[in-house]
Amino acid sequence: IHPSELKFQGDAFIQQVIKAANDTKIPCVIHLDHSGVKDIERAIRDGFTSVMIDASHESFEDNVAITKRVVELAHPLGVSVEAELGTIGSTDNDTEVAGGATNIIYTKPEEAVKFVEETNCDCLAIAIGTAHGLYPKGFKPELKLELLKEIKKVVNVPLVLHGGSGN
């Protein structure tokens, strides 16, 4: 669930989603995507089981500090934390809604190692050239698959790729 959906739908809708998830026999999580600390606090209060702190537009040091704060809040309550390092591109003019950036800052393997070690995040969204939003006709993202392989070799948490579907 994206933060803009949280604001639009409100708590009653979220409670129905959580009830449906809890009633199914299929293992699932209720995940809050691309969020700040305030929305994450609300999501945890409401019963989400997974959150994504997106401080990727901050400095490396601030991203670490913010992510650590969220991990310290979430983990004691059994909530998993996804973080983002580097910036995902956006094909949308409204990058806040899209969750992307106008310029991609690729994730550096050595920073990914340090980030995961310092934050204790459960999974890491990395930037390898994907972009949020509908890809314009003829648009071909330039994916750095070797960078993905390098990061996978050195990081011990699952990696997440946002913006990979072109929609």
Regions found by a protein language model. Give the residues of each.
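Alpha/beta enzyme core
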Residues: S4, G10-P27, H34-P158, N167
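Histidine-centered divalent metal-coordination motifs
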Residues: H162-G164
